[in-house]
């Protein structure tokens, strides 16, 4: 089966439902409602996980932990085309994998409380990446994201900046008068 693990924009829901069996990144009630509506039109029953921003980092997607219970309640009552399977989170980046443990534990505890409150099973916890997946599994992860472990490090992306013809000549670059700016690669 195919899993969508990245951010999903509401205008891309139909396309995502055509391609993926499981969506790990449902980060708002509005998105869940949109998935339910489009799934109903398409005659589908998508499996989803709610993405929770356990760390509170502004750079991370996901709903606030305090919004999860209300979202689950609404999905169970008002979104019959959705199969809610669990929760997903991403821990803050750290060189020390143990730093991720409290975030993974908090997500597991949240899942356990939701199962008890709503008398439902939420068998999936999607958490942990190449640098911290062992800790995630110890804390209950059922799905991990292992890009670097499987495919290696990403290539370094070089930064480019536009330069004027004068700067280009001073920097040893040939001047360029084509369609687009002259750029200098910064290592």
Regions found by a protein language model. Name each.
Residues 1-131, 137-139, 151:
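Conserved alpha/beta-domain cores
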Residues 137, 141-187:
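C-terminal helical cap(s) of enzyme catalytic domains, especially alpha/beta-barrels
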């Amino acid at each position: 089966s195919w899993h969508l693990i990245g951010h999903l924009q509401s205008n891309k829901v139909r396309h995502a439902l055509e391609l993926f069996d499981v969506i790990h990144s449902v980060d708002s009630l509005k998105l869940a409602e949109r998935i339910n509506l489009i799934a109903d039109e398409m005659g589908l029953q998508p499996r989803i996980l709610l993405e929770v921003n356990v760390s509170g980092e502004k750079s991370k997607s996901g709903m606030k932990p305090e919004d999860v219970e209300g979202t689950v309640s609404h999905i169970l009552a008002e979104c019959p085309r959705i199969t809610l399977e669990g929760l997903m989170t991403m821990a803050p980046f750290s060189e020390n994998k143990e730093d991720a443990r409290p975030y993974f534990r908090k997500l597991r505890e949240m899942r356990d409380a939701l199962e008890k409150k709503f008398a439902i099973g939420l068998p999936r916890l999607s958490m942990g990446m190449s640098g911290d997946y062992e800790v995630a599994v110890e804390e209950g992860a059922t799905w991990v994201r292992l890009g670097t472990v499987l495919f290696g490090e990403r290539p370094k992306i070089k930064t480019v900046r536009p330069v004027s013809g004068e700067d280009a000549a001073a920097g040893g670059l040939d001047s360029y008068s084509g369609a687009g700016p002259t750029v200098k690669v910064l290592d």
